[in-house]
Structures are given as structure tokens and as C-alpha cells.
Regions:
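Divalent metal-coordination and catalytic microenvironments
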Residues: 47, 76, 101-102, 128, ...
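Core catalytic region of metal-dependent phosphoesterases/phosphodiesterases
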Residues: 41-45, 50-119
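Short glycine- and acidic-rich boundary segments immediately preceding or forming the N-terminal edge
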Residues: 2-49, 53
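Beta-strand-turn-beta hairpins that frame and shape the catalytic cleft
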Residues: 36-43, 151-160
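Active-site neighborhood of divalent metal-dependent phosphoester bond hydrolases
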Residues: 84-152, 156-158, 168, 175, ...
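Conserved beta-sheet core of the metallophosphoesterase superfamily
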Residues: 185-254
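Active-site environment of divalent metal-dependent phosphoester hydrolases
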Residues: 49-53, 79-82, 104-108, 167-169, ...
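Active-site-proximal beta-strand elements of phosphoester/diester hydrolases
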Residues: 42-49, 159-165, 226-227
Length: 267
């Protein structure tokens, strides 16, 4: 995803444009700040990808209190798993705070007519084959309100949430006037997780939770913590972390269903 497709000969080679180059589905807000949660606890969940049953189980396991706790999401609520529309319904929950992921960005591109449905189906969007255009546009309208970055708290307890990766400091992140290259990096970047990025390029960055690149276990590289443990895959799990307490919980969809998660109500 991160390597540019090219066309032509070595002498005339040009970069093939991707739908996300122009970012017509630019979020209404690039970065959103949240005060520290003095009344309850904050959690961050990895790429959900429609695996809502695993989320139901984990919320019960952590005794999530919707009156005072908050759940932040690194994005990619939809595609690949079985319950993408249930995952989108989480956006209406007052305790749920997601950032835009590349799969939500693809949904918006399809709704805008910038991307063919067949391309999206190829990366997991086939659940929407029978979803009318009108409903898809409704989802896109709500997804466009999601920021690319969420900043929680300040000082030593501050942490950031974004989808893929970021190179820069807290000050760079807070500025919010991201270039097209930075926006693509926030949604699609994999340099750091795959070992191709320089960890020193994140000096001055607070603890930052990311998803996008599936990892077998939570992986920290410098300030960035990758928590997409592949919930949709046969050997994957959904992971929730509690930043301040440095705690984590994980479960597979299969194991969650064996525990009756499908019958659990979301808060």
C-alpha cells in the first residue's frame, strides 16, 4: 500500500495517481484535542474491522462504564470482518471516539464516486455490495466528521491516537495543517512498522497509538505503539489497551463467541 505504483520505462516512469492523492474526502477536522479524563478511564482499541463480538466481550472484561469511561479507536472500523454496519453504529455512542482509517477513507471515496466499488471490495468492502448508494453516502457523511488525529490530555500523561504512522513531534501533530503527503502517511503509512522508517524522526512525540499494520503482538517503535493484532484474521485478536495503566486485553472473535459475546449488549 505504501509503495507508489509506477508506469512507463525507467526513463519516463511516472507515478500512477491513487484516489487518496487528492484527499477530496478531507476530514472536517485534522486534529481534535480532548481533556484528560479525570472522572473515569481511557482505553484505545485496535483496528476493529467489523469484529464487534470481540469488542462486546472486551468491554465486559474491562468493566467499561459508559457514564465516565472513553474508548478511542485507531480507525478501520469497517471491512473484512462480519459486522461493518454494527461497527459504524458505534459512531453514535457518546463514549466512542474514532479517527479516520484508510478503510473509512475508501468508503468515502466510493460514496463520492472517486473510487470504483470493485477496488474497495478487493480490500474488504464486499459487505457493502447490497448497501444502497444513499446509505453509503449517509455513512460517508458521518465518517467525514472524524479527525485524522486525536490528542488526549497534556504534559507527561498526554497520548495521541491516529491510524497508520506519523513522523514529527507533538508540535507538528498539533499544528494540524498537514500536507497531502502527511495525510497519506497518517492513513496509509507503513514505513515505521515495517522497519523502513527512521525512529529518530519522531523526537518530541508523546506516546502515540496506531493501527493499520497487523502485528502478532503489541509493538512499540520509539513513541509509536502498534495495536492492530489482526482481529479479522484466523489467528488474530482484537486488542484494547489502557494507556495510563499500561494494561492490555486481547481476544479472538471465535473465543469471544464461545463465551457468548454475540448475546452481550453494547453499553
Amino acid at each position: 500500500m505504501t509503495r507508489a505504483d509506477t508506469i512507463g520505462t525507467p526513463h519516463t516512469r511516472a507515478r500512477r495517481r491513487h484516489y487518496h492523492d487528492e484527499m477530496n474526502a478531507t476530514p472536517a477536522t485534522f486534529v481534535q484535542h480532548h481533556d484528560a479524563n479525570e472522572a473515569g478511564r481511557d482505553f484505545v482499541v485496535g483496528d476493529l474491522h467489523g469484529c464487534v463480538d470481540a469488542l462486546r466481550y472486551l468491554l465486559r472484561q474491562i468493566a467499561f462504564d459508559p457514564t465516565c469511561d472513553r474508548l478511542f479507536s485507531v480507525g478501520d472500523l469497517v471491512d473484512r470482518g462480519e459486522h461493518s454496519e454494527q461497527a459504524l453504529a458505534l459512531l453514535a455512542k457518546p463514549w466512542f471516539y474514532a479517527v479516520l482509517g484508510n478503510h473509512e477513507d475508501a468508503l468515502c471515496a466510493v460514496a463520492d464516486g472517486r473510487l470504483r466499488r470493485q477496488w474497495w471490495y478487493g480490500i474488504g468492502g464486499a459487505w457493502a455490495a447490497d448497501v444502497p448508494d444513499e446509505r453509503l453516502r449517509y455513512y460517508a457523511e458521518h465518517l467525514r466528521t472524524l479527525p485524522l488525529v486525536r490528542v488526549i490530555g497534556s504534559g507527561k500523561t498526554r497520548f495521541n491516537v491516529l491510524h497508520a504512522e506519523f513522523f514529527g513531534s507533538d508540535a507538528d501533530l498539533d499544528a494540524g495543517n498537514y500536507s497531502a503527503e502527511t495525510r497519506q502517511q497518517l492513513l496509509w503509512g507503513r514505513e515505521l512498522a515495517l522497519g523502513h522508517g527512521d525512529p529518530l524522526r519522531q523526537r518530541g512525540l508523546s506516546l502515540t497509538y496506531c493501527g493499520h499494520t497487523p502485528v502478532r503482538d503489541i509493538t512499540q517503535i520509539g513513541s509509536q505503539v502498534f495495536i492492530d493484532t489482526g482481529a479479522f484474521g484466523p489467528d488474530g485478536t482484537l486488542t484494547i489497551v489502557q494507556p495510563q495503566a499500561l494494561r492490555r486485553w486481547s481476544i479472538s472473535v471465535e473465543a469471544a463467541r464461545a463465551e457468548g459475546a454475540a448475546e452481550l449488549a453494547l453499553p
